[in-house]
């Protein structure tokens, strides 16, 4: 799986899947083939400035994956490892935290959106058609009065944030039920986002938290820490709790998830629609399964959606803080 992103040196913007910039017609230079080209916000720029000993706070910076960054059109490898081993982050903490306002400024944002607008609109159209077609198909094929109720599995991360908006726009319904699976291991910023910004931005969207009675650290003593090969935590802290919530629905759940194939080799094998899931009364649907990081961020910036604060600080994933899949 691959997706190419080009850099237009004239406009100073990434252009997705188009070597010729749609704005200025200049030929771009390829900067990514893995579909990763994420905006870097002021908070992360401050940290990066401390790491490399160079002020890039006012630079045009994009993250390309695997510790690779594009700084004013020049690729740089910026590794956190040695920085943390030397405990230099303790020295820089005050500099990073001072006046840490919500500055979402992205260089040449208008040009970036203009250059990629046709591309993202095609992705949006396809995803929304998938949602409406699936809902209609299940409604027409329902037997014995069994109905499927559209819901969104919401984690507070960028992918479920995008899926939430796509599903509600496609169905023209702000009242689609959202289930937030609280594993008790979320970043504080996730709770702030779910209980604050998301609710304020979407006052008519019900958010039902699913809480667990289990203690993660006590279970670690029983099963051992979760690993990529033994993720018992997902079953105990997410699946079982959500299953209890789904039982309260007046019908079965058509659950829309923010899962993408580009996230891992395991997920490359996923079907877009899973009619046989871990939860018997549930069908899983993944509208953005073939999207890449660059697509998700383009959508967020294009729609002007609020998002989890942790991304501003450089986190690439904002699920459980101790997740074994958090390798980048």
Regions found by a protein language model. Give the residues of each.
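ATP-dependent adenylation/nucleotidyltransferase module used to activate substrates
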Residues: 2-28, 42-47, 51-302
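Short metal-binding segments enriched for Cys and/or His
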Residues: 28-34
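Residue-level signal for threonine
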Residues: 40-41, 187, 306-308, 328
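Short, conserved alpha-helical segments within structured domains
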Residues: 156-159, 315-319
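Immediate flanking context of iron-sulfur cluster ligation sites
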Residues: 225, 303-317
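Histidine- and/or cysteine-centered catalytic micro-motif in compact active-site loops
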Residues: 260-262, 312, 326
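Local cysteine-cluster metal-coordination motifs and their immediate loop/turn environment
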Residues: 316-328
């Amino acid at each position: 799986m691959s997706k190419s992103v080009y850099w237009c040196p004239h406009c100073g913007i990434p252009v997705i899947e188009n070597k010729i910039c749609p704005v200025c017609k200049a030929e771009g230079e390829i900067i990514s083939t893995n579909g990763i080209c994420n905006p870097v916000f002021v908070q992360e720029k401050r940290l990066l400035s401390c790491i490399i000993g160079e002020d890039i706070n006012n630079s045009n910076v994009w993250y390309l994956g695997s510790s690779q960054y594009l700084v004013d059109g020049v690729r740089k490898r910026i590794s956190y490892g040695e920085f943390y081993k030397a405990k230099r982050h303790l020295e820089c903490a005050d500099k990073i935290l001072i006046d840490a306002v919500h500055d979402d400024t992205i260089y040449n944002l208008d040009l970036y959106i203009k250059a990629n607008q046709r591309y993202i609109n095609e992705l949006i159209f396809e995803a929304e058609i998938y949602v409406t077609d699936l809902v209609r198909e299940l409604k027409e094929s329902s037997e014995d009065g069994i109905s499927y109720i559209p819901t969104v599995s919401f984690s507070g991360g960028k992918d479920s944030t995008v899926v939430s908006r796509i599903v509600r726009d496609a169905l023209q319904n702000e009242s689609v039920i959202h289930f937030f699976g609280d594993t008790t291991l979320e970043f504080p910023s996730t709770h702030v986002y779910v209980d604050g910004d998301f609710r304020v931005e979407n006052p008519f969207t019900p958010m039902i938290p699913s809480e667990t009675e289990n203690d993660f650290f006590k279970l670690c003593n029983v099963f051992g820490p979760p690993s990529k090969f033994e993720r018992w935590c997902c079953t105990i802290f997410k699946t079982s709790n959500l299953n209890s919530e789904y039982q309260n629905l007046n019908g079965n759940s058509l659950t829309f998830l923010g899962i993408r194939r580009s996230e891992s080799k395991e997920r490359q094998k996923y079907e877009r629609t899973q009619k046989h899931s871990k939860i018997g009364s549930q069908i899983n649907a993944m509208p953005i399964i073939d999207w890449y990081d660059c697509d998700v961020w383009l959508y967020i910036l294009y729609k002007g959606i609020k998002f989890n604060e942790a991304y501003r600080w450089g986190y690439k994933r904002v699920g459980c803080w101790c997740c074994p899949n958090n390798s980048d």
